Amino acid sequence: MPLIIVVAGIALLLLLTIKIKLNTFVSLIIVSIAVAIASGMDLSKVVTSVESGLGGTLGHIGLIFGFGVMLGRLLADAGGAQRIALTMLNYFGKNKLDWAVVCSAFIVGIALFFEVGLILLVPILFAIAREAKISPMFMCVPMLSGLLVAHGFLPPHPGPTVIAREYGADVGLVLIYGIIVGIPTFILCGPVLNKFCQRIIPDAFKKEGNIASLGATRRFSESEMPGFGISFLTAMLPVILMAVVTIIQMTHAKSAADSGLFYNVILFLGNSTIAMLISLLFAIYTMGLGRGKTIPDLMDSCGKAIAGIAGLLLIIGGGGAFKQVLIDSGVGQYISTLVSGMDINPILMAWGVAAFLRICLGSATVAAISTAGLVIPLLAVHPNTNLALITLATGAGSCICSHVNDASFWMIKDFFGLTTKETLLSWTLMSTLLSISGLIFILLASLVL
């Protein structure tokens, strides 16, 4: 019965969002309440469960997400992201544009959320394509693979950040393992897959794209952009801070001496929220004050960045409410009991649930957060599971098979002037391979970590 309730809840969510076209956040709250009631939860506890799920999720991610999106906006508005992309392209040269693009997208993607990175990088690709006299499609798949790996695997992106907290995983470890697993994944799904796509959809690689669909975009001159070194450091500072502290924790056993002021300061600086705040303040100087911009101008950019994610924050909160209802209603525990005797690898379980929800719901973030509600009870049966790898497996599963119920599918189709079939055989194929290959690399990592 609980399984039927979950499936019915997902079906209701699809009906509300796709057929009736109700707002996704409102739909998630309605479905959360419906699933709670159908599961037999005491009516007096339904609203409390929804509120605690929403508040608990946003309470953690709100600061990280807010600081992160402001940092990304400052980097983009100063031309830092464009500098990173162009430097990588110049370094690799015309013959290895796909390698340059995938590396640039991954670096930029750490600081910028998927849709923002896409809108920022596409005009740069079109300009390079014109100069190189090639179709921008030659760089499409590599760019998307770099952005998607960062989006699905790495904090401070919303999915990995929220599920790391829900599972109790160390965010720094998720970052380190995510980079280790992510690099071979985006290489396979970027430059390597790109060659295959050229053979199966050759006509797509003759198209000039649809740059007009992006509207007005700004392209910085050479003198307007900051240097590569400072741009790279600004984008990567959150990663550096969290990774360094995590490595210190891993290599130094905590003793009585470690509990002193120095050790506590290190832990404080490595906290994901503090690391993002420090990085934001650093960006305000390197991408703003140090380049002659005023505080009002910088705060205007930050304000616009926050305004742009208000809807997304609510959707993430709605996903958190759904997750909490699955836990509080006992549905997650029921599924855990059901599969506990099957000896299923929890990494495979997390990936499979996230993949199923992603295909049904379209949103990678909502799929990842909802997965936690079903997987958390299972972790009690497998207490020695590497929680960072469970987080990555959930993220990898949430990346699979982006198709017609995902807004990104239509954005990519429109930007590059593709047919639906061509989009399925490029973007959808890439996201599916990325999810599966990511899972394989995570399973390999679990053998040694």
From Swiss-Prot:
The cellular location(s) given in this protein's UniProt record come to: Cell inner membrane
Record-annotated membrane-spanning stretches: 2-22, 24-44, 52-72, 106-126, 134-154, 173-193, 228-248, 265-285, 302-322, 337-357, 361-381, 429-449
Q: Name one Pfam family in it.
A: GntP_permease
Topology in the membrane? Multi-pass membrane protein
A GO molecular function annotation here is:
gluconate transmembrane transporter activity
- GO BP annotation list: gluconate transmembrane transport
Q: Where on the tree of life does the source sit, at the highest rank?
A: Bacteria
Tell me yes or no: is Plastid among this UniProt entry's keywords.
no
Sorted alphabetically, the Gene Ontology cellular component annotations on this record are:
plasma membrane
Alphabetic keyword roster = Cell inner membrane, Cell membrane, Membrane, Transmembrane, Transmembrane helix, Transport
Q: Does the keyword Nucleotide-binding apply?
A: no
Main location per the UniProt record: membrane
UniProt-listed InterPro entries: Glcn_transporter
Family, as annotated? Belongs to the GntP permease family.
Q: What is this protein called?
A: Uncharacterized permease YjhF
Q: Which organism is it from?
A: Escherichia coli (strain K12)
Q: Which gene name does the record give?
A: yjhF
